[in-house]
Amino acid sequence: LTADAPDGMPVEIFDVLGGGEGVLTDHFTDPRKYYEKLDEQVELLMKKREGVFTNAGLKDVVLAPALAGILAHEAVGHTVEADLVLGGSVAAHNLGKRVATDLITMVDYAHTLPDGSRAPLPVYVDDEGTPASDEVLIKDGILVGYMNSRETAQHFGMEPHGNARGYAYSDEPLIRMRNTAILPGKDKLEDMIAAIDDGYYFTQTNNGQADTTGEFMFGIMMGYEIKNGKLGRAIRDTTISGVAFQLLQTVDMLSDDMVWSCSGTCGKKQ
């Protein structure tokens, strides 16, 4: 959805409908069930239309699940893929070391979530024939594992957990993530916002990239000011950047809410 702001500049917002289990036709049998979601997007667009530009600099922020997810995938997940570790990623010399506060546990789920439900992208066996199982990557802030193929698992003396997949049948299997997430904590969103005097609550992203040093840059499509512990005005598009393991070592609150996002695509050379 697009609208013109009072200054004549266009503002845009979008969201992904569907995703998760099933195929496209499973999610779009009745368009009416998305009317409420579309109304919400229009309301957000009108807020963004009146939004303000962010101030540059270091800020305390709250990251919604969409931002936490892209951080887990792009800025952390790729650095602990063992082929990239062999290529010199930041994780190469950090195994067994603290890379985050003890609030952070990050897992790459194979096919079944802790509550017994099916993961958004269930993988039961990978393209090397390895039975898939969960891989704990960060445990209470300590980097404890890599995602492996059979070859890299032998190199590192680890067990493969089914992370080798090819984009198509003719592609060589590469080490890939499956259902990667930072596990929820115990804090409430309202308490997290109340703890910030001057910062931002970022809710939606429109792009992101990172390199093997963990340095990242994410586009922010929707968010709000936080002033004196309360949400303020909506903001216009902006960009955040940082270094993942440095950021994770500043986390002091973690929401008890968890939302899966199925909107991303990841090529990794294929």
List PLM regions with ranges.
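N-terminal small-residue-enriched
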Residues: 1-270
